[in-house]
Curated annotation (Swiss-Prot):
Its EC number is 4.2.1.96. This is Putative pterin-4-alpha-carbinolamine dehydratase. Belongs to the pterin-4-alpha-carbinolamine dehydratase family. One of its GO terms (biological process) is tetrahydrobiopterin biosynthetic process. PANTHER family: PTERIN-4-ALPHA-CARBINOLAMINE DEHYDRATASE-RELATED. It is an enzyme of class 4 (lyase). Signal peptide: none annotated. Keywords: Lyase. It catalyses: (4aS,6R)-4a-hydroxy-L-erythro-5,6,7,8-tetrahydrobiopterin = (6R)-L-erythro-6,7-dihydrobiopterin + H2O. Disulfide bonds: none annotated.
Length: 112
């Protein structure tokens, strides 16, 4: 388990700062299987998880839903046959907060 996966999310208000470029570089290295995407001008973290069938993909999605509820931070999730695409960003600040990196790392632990 990574250091990030052991951290707790903090409340993220609309005036919370987005991660700086320096922080972004450091945090991205801690979650190497994730990519940074920009959609509609909003920076987001994304990863595609592969599974052998739809049932396993759905089971992972349900575990992720439980994690998101427990941490009060919710991703974009696209569940398809054999894969789940997970996208993290902080809606309130329209960009990336440290919480998104924490949740990406925690999402990776669901495979263990």
């Amino acid at each position: 388990m990574t250091e990030l996966a052991q951290m707790k999310c903090e409340a993220c208000q609309a005036d919370a700062p987005k991660v700086s470029d320096a922080e972004l570089g450091e945090l991205v290295r801690m979650i190497p299987d994730w990519t940074v995407e920009v959609r509609d001008g909003i920076m987001q973290l994304e990863r595609v998880y592969k599974f052998k069938n739809f049932k396993l993909a759905m089971a992972f999605t349900n575990k992720l839903a439980d994690l998101a509820e427990a941490d009060f931070h919710h991703p974009g999730i696209l569940t398809e046959w054999g894969k789940v695409t997970v996208t993290w960003w902080s809606h309130s600040i329209k960009g990336l907060h440290k919480n998104d990196f924490i949740m990406a790392a925690k999402t990776d632990t669901l495979l263990d």
